[in-house]
Swiss-Prot record:
Lipid-attached positions, S-diacylglycerol cysteine: C24
Protein name: Membrane protein insertase YidC 2
Originating species: Streptococcus pyogenes serotype M6 (strain ATCC BAA-946 / MGAS10394)
Lipidation (N-palmitoyl cysteine): C24
Keywords, alphabetical: Cell membrane, Chaperone, Lipoprotein, Membrane, Palmitate, Protein transport, Signal, Transmembrane, Transmembrane helix, Transport
GO process terms (BP): protein insertion into membrane; protein transport
Location(s) in or outside the cell: Cell membrane
Biased composition (Polar residues): 271-288
Amino acid sequence: MKLTLNRILFSGLALSILFTLTGCVGRDAHGNPKGMIWEFLGKPMSYFIDYFANNAGLGYGLAIIIVTIIVRTLILPLGLYQSWKASYQSEKMTFLKPVFEPINKRIKQASSQEEKMAAQTELMAAQRAHGINPLGGIGCLPLLIQMPFFSAMYFAAQYTKGVSTSTFMGIDLGSRSLVLTAIIAALYFFQSWLSMMAVSEEQREQMKTMMYTMPIMMIFMSFSLPAGVGLYWLVGGFFSIIQQLITTYLLKPRLHKQIKEEYAKTPPKAYQSTSSRKDVTPSQNMEQANLPKKIKSNRNAGKQRKR
C-alpha cells in the first residue's frame, strides 16, 4: 500500500513537471511562445542567450549553459529549502519508528478491512500528534515557484533564433543527440543513486522504482527534443547533483543532530488512542437486550386473549 502510494505520487510528480514545462508558456498560431511567463522570464533569458552568443562571441551552446547556470543558481535556495523539508520529515520518521511500528504491525496483521482501516486511521492520528505530515516533505510551494523559471528557460533554449543552426563541440544544437542524451541519463541516474544513499535500508527498498523513473523520463525528453534544449537538461543534471550532495552531506547530518537533541530532552511517547474499540456485533446485543421486552409483550397479549 505504502509502496504503491509512493510510486503513484512520484509518477504524478514527474508527469506534472513535464506538463508544466510545456504548459506554463503558451504558443500562438505560428507555434511561437507567448504568455506572461514568456514575456517576463522567457524573453529576458532569450535575450541573454543571444547576447552571450553574439555580443560576447561565445556561441549559442556556451550561452545556453551560462544562462542556465545563472537561473539555476538563483533558484537553488528554493530547491535546498524543499530538500530541507523532505529531510526533516524523513529524519523525524526514523526517530519515531519505534512509536509507529506497533501500529504498522497491526495494519499488516489485520484480519479484516475494517480492522485495517481503523489501524491506518490511528497511524495518521499518531503522525499528526508527533508533527509528521506524510506529504509535507514534498514542498509544493517551492516547486511551484521554480516551475515558471524551468519552463521559461526550456523555451528560451528551444526558440532563441540562431540556436537551431549552431553547433557546440561538434553537436548540432538543432537536432537530437544520442551522446548528449546518454550523458544526461548518467547524470540523473547518479543523482538518484545519491538520494538513495541518504535514506535507510527500508526506505531504499521503497524507492527503487523512483531511482529509475527520473533517468528514464530524462532520456525520453532529451531524445525527443533538440540538443539545444538538451544542454539545458545537462546543466540541470549537474545542479541536481550539487543539491543532492549538499542535502546528503550538510543538511541531513545537521538535521539528524538537531532532532536527536530534541528527542533526548523530550523522548517521544507511545501514541495513546482516544477512541475505544467498538463492538463489531451491535445488532446481536440489541436483539438480546430487547428479547425480554418481546417476551413480556407476548405474555400480556395472551392474557388479553383469554379475557
